[in-house]
Design a protein with these regions (language model features):
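DNA major-groove recognition helix of helix-turn-helix/homeodomain DNA-binding modules
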Residues: 108
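Histidine-centered nuclease catalytic patch
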Residues: 50, 71-103, 112-131
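Domain-level detector of nuclease and nuclease-like folds
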Residues: 113-200
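Short hydrophobic targeting helices and cationic amphipathic motifs
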Residues: 3-9, 14, 127
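Short, charged surface segments at domain edges that flank catalytic/cofactor-binding sites
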Residues: 16-68, 90-96, 179, 191-198
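Residues that form or immediately flank small-molecule/cofactor binding pockets and catalytic motifs
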Residues: 32, 87, 136
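C-terminal, charged low-complexity interaction regions
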Residues: 22, 160-250
Length: 250
């Protein structure tokens, strides 16, 4: 990669492009007892042409996606739905394919529907290597969420960014209200995270630093709510380089 072709990109974007970092919030479809049962039940459902929306599939998806929506990363959700990454449109294979089933909140599932295709598959693609997640400004000011492509402009990246923007800002009067609630939850999450970062940097007590480090590690792991925003907050600031050690290598 020739850096002169990417002048103006933040330091993290350049480091990703040059292979210095391997960041990914990549959800692994682990083989567990729950997923084995879900796959077996999906096979039966396919043969009987019955519903894929069954207990074992819901429980397995909840486990795989750490109980959070794969699109907005919100965990404070009361309504979840099974989402098809590639809209099945009646296609039996896509409809019952375990690898095509994702865990989504009702808000994001309704917004996505079959309007965004193709999009990145977070169980296969290093989403954070392709998209930067940033929150600019503060509440009461010109607060704005930014999703920007890192490196190659691909159709699935562009569509994913469009979906993220729609999910976080809403597309109808009702969805805009729901999106506002998601952004409020994100804001509170990031505020708490920033406080941990500040305390970690300021404390001189070794034991206290270890305790806060544990909290930071918890907030940056794959299962954390809004992990993408938190990781990019660290990656974008040189002063936080010490905290990068708590970001898991996937």
């Amino acid at each position: 990669i020739y850096l002169q072709n990417f002048q103006g990109l933040p330091r993290k974007d350049l480091r990703i492009l040059n292979g210095e970092e391997k960041p990914m919030i990549k959800i692994e479809r682990k083989e567990t007892e729950k997923t084995k049962q879900a796959i077996a039940d999906l096979q039966k459902a396919s043969e009987n042409e019955s519903s894929y929306n069954i207990e074992s599939v819901n429980q397995a998806l909840k486990e795989i996606f750490h109980g959070k929506c794969y699109i907005c990363e919100n965990k404070a959700v009361t309504s979840y739905q099974i989402e098809h990454l590639v809209p099945h449109r009646g296609d039996k294979t896509l409809k019952y394919d375990w690898k095509n089933l994702f865990w989504s909140c009702a808000h994001c599932n309704n917004i996505k529907s079959d309007k965004y295709e193709p999009i990145l598959d977070c169980t296969k693609e290093p989403v954070e290597k392709m998209i930067a997640f940033r929150k600019r400004g503060y509440f009461g000011t010109d607060e704005k969420l930014e999703f920007t492509s890192v490196g190659e402009e691909r159709e699935d990246v562009k569509n994913t960014i469009a979906l993220l923007e729609a999910a976080y800002y809403g597309t109808t009067p009702q969805k805009k209200i729901e999106a506002q609630i998601i952004r409020k939850t994100l804001r509170q999450n990031l505020s708490n995270f920033k406080e941990y970062v500040r305390e970690y940097q300021e404390t001189e007590d070794k034991e206290e630093k270890e305790d806060i480090g544990y909290l930071l590690k918890k907030e940056l792991r794959d299962s954390a709510a809004f992990a993408a925003f938190k990781r990019w907050l660290i990656w974008d600031n040189e002063m936080f380089s010490e905290i990068e050690q708590f970001i898991p290598e996937n």
